[in-house]
UniProtKB/Swiss-Prot annotation:
Residues 95-144 are annotated as: Disordered. GO terms for cellular component: cytosolic small ribosomal subunit. GO terms for biological process: translation. This is Small ribosomal subunit protein bS6. Coiled coil: none annotated. It comes from Paramagnetospirillum magneticum (strain ATCC 700264 / AMB-1) (Magnetospirillum magneticum).
Amino acid sequence: MSLYECVFIARQDISTPQVETLTEELSNIITQGGGSVSKKEYWGLRNIAYRVKKNRKGHYVLLNIDAPSAAVKEMERQMSINEDVLRTLTIRVEELEEGPSAMMQSKSRDDRPRRGEGDDRPRRDDREDRPRRDREPRRMEGGE
């Protein structure tokens, strides 16, 4: 059996439980074909680089698959028939990644506070130790 990574994008107007149901249906196709799905990752609702079938966003899902090629072809056929699937990409790999994918790692990095957020330090413009430089308004010469 060969190892595959499959990423698919589902329509933006379906709910997260519907995406999970779709993922389970695709996993069942693989298991019925004699393979197994070792990892299922839901990457969330993300922007698409360009409009695909009138959608600007999509639910991204990653599957790590260990299956014969016939099962993978059947899964790809079912995805092409399904209206909820916008795009798919299935590639054959030498070995499957253990742990979270790069997308999930970057997602956890985005959860950290950004630089300057959450600091208790005073900001430069909030310093009270500097004297205020109030000056009188300028007058135009020869006007009044």
